[in-house]
Regions:
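Positively charged n-region of N-terminal signal peptides that target proteins for export
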Residues: 1-5
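Bacterial N-terminal signal peptides
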Residues: 7-15
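Carbohydrate-interacting regions of secretory-pathway proteins
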Residues: 20-198
């Protein structure tokens, strides 16, 4: 039996472990992507009244370095802040007044602290088993990709991580954008998609 040349084995291994390119992923039927996988188009900073202060269309990085666009991945790095407040929220420039389903995948470094803002209220998105508050999750995968699904109906959000309930009935205002928080350490988000419901 002939053995494969070592370069062929290495090439296969590299191909298998390469991260997916931005164009390899598409939203599920009926969903619209909120992150284009290339830059921060459609995202920006808002003030406390949620008025848009700054937008990052066509830019690979936020003005304070807290958020950056990598192929397929939106990186949140609290340690990159060169200026501005300790806490930051990156918001969609679009608002969502209707019922919807939001799907988002995240990967946290150890003890990372971020959050997903739903119109205004925050759903904690962290390295849950270390940073809490949902330390009893059994399907959470530390330092790996996890999926959050938020279903909003009549201004109430049902939130799950890998099929386990995080919040059963989180009350929301009637309209608002989607936001991602930079608080502690690094968090990565990908496959951010939303589908409006009747």
């Amino acid at each position: 039996m002939k053995s494969l040349p070592i370069f062929a084995v290495l090439a296969t291994a590299i191909f298998v472990t390469m991260p997916a390119r931005a164009e390899d992923w598409k939203p599920e039927p009926g969903f619209v992507s909120l992150y284009n996988g290339k830059d921060l188009t459609g995202w920006g900073y808002r003030d406390k009244e949620q008025k848009v202060l700054e937008t990052f269309d066509g830019k690979a990085e936020a003005s304070d370095g807290r958020y950056s666009a990598k192929p397929s991945i939106l990186v949140v790095n609290a340690h990159n802040a060169e200026k501005g407040p300790k806490l930051r929220q990156l918001w969609t420039t679009q608002v969502f007044p209707k019922n919807f389903i939001l799907k988002i995948e995240f990967r946290a470094v150890v003890n990372a602290d971020s959050g997903i803002f739903l119109r205004k209220p925050q759903l904690q998105c962290r390295d849950y088993l270390v940073a809490g508050p949902y330390k009893t999750l059994t399907k959470y995968k530390p330092q790996d990709w996890n999926t959050i699904i938020v279903t909003v109906k009549d201004n109430v959000a049902h939130c799950e991580c890998n099929g386990e309930v995080l919040e059963d009935a989180l009350k929301l205002p009637e309209s608002g954008p989607i936001g991602l928080e930079a608080d502690r350490d690094q968090m990565e988000y990908r496959h951010i998609q939303i589908k409006e419901l009747p």
